[in-house]
From Swiss-Prot:
GO terms for cellular component: beta-catenin destruction complex; cell body; cytosol; extracellular exosome; nuclear envelope lumen; nucleoplasm; nucleus; SCF ubiquitin ligase complex. Keywords: Acetylation, Cytoplasm, Nucleus, Phosphoprotein, Ubl conjugation pathway. It is found in: Nucleus; Cytoplasm. Residues 168-228 form the SGS domain. CDD domains: p23_CacyBP (cd06468). The modification Phosphoserine is found at residues 3, 34. The lineage of its organism: Eukaryota, Metazoa, Chordata, Craniata, Vertebrata. Coiled coil: none annotated. This is Calcyclin-binding protein.
Length: 228
């Protein structure tokens, strides 16, 4: 029954209650009056509850501002050393200890690692190192975040072995720079190879100096041959 109808019934019961003189009739009307008032109260509560629900549904959804990570910076500066069990890579990043733990991620494979630091001062930082000099244990490798520093711990697959370089590429580049000496050839031939490399890599002044020394050496040899 609508609230308006209940209100009309209540008014009529009140009128009858005022006119009634017999106790039995008055008790019945009083009980009916209480019943109608309770129904009206329940109707009003239901109406208020529905109104509140409608207002909640009409509220705009809260807008969550996206976390801006800006652009990604590639990390090129780092230091490293080693122990019998680990190769340790040190990366300096100011404030890295203040970002959430889940923002510092490292993925390991047997011959590589990939570091990603997200949302540090509005930027992300990335470092990918492939072709490690020797295999590492993926399960035994880990990271530590210290004050302004990320420490990457690569567990050596074979302990008590020395790494002269961090990567295979670095090793190959360094070995190319070394002059090649063949211990089985004549020492003078090895010296000539070194001089030849210096000549090829040198500037014009260096080439003139070597040419002059070469001519003087040949002249001395020729002079020595004629004295015997």
């Amino acid at each position: 029954m609508a609230s308006e109808e209940l209100q009309k019934d209540l008014e009529e019961v009140k009128v009858l209650l005022e006119k009634a003189t017999r106790k039995r009739v008055r008790d019945a009307l009083t009980a009916e009056k209480s019943k109608i008032e309770t129904e009206i109260k329940n109707k009003m509560q239901q109406k208020s509850q529905k109104k509140a629900e409608l207002l909640d549904n009409e509220k705009p959804a809260a807008v969550v501002a996206p976390i801006t990570t800006g652009y990604t910076v590639k990390i090129s500066n780092y230091g490293w050393d080693q122990s019998d069990k680990f190769v340790k890579i040190y990366i300096t990043l100011t404030g890295v200890h203040q970002v959430p733990t889940e923002n510092v991620q490292v993925h390991f494979t047997e011959r590589s690692f990939d570091l990603l630091v997200k949302n540090l001062n509005g930027k992300s930082y990335s470092m990918i190192v492939n072709n490690l000099l020797k295999p590492i244990s993926v399960e035994g490798s880990s990271k530590k975040v210290k004050t302004d520093t990320v420490l990457i711990l690569c567990r050596k697959k074979v302990e008590n072995t020395r790494w002269d370089y961090l990567t295979q590429v670095e090793k190959e580049c360094k070995e190319k720079e070394k002059p090649s000496y063949d211990t089985e050839t004549d020492p003078s031939e090895g010296l000539m190879n070194v001089l030849k490399k210096i000549y090829e890599d040198g500037d014009d002044d260096m080439k003139r100096t070597i040419n002059k020394a070469w001519v003087e050496s040949r002249e001395k040899q020729a002079k020595g041959d004629t004295e015997f």
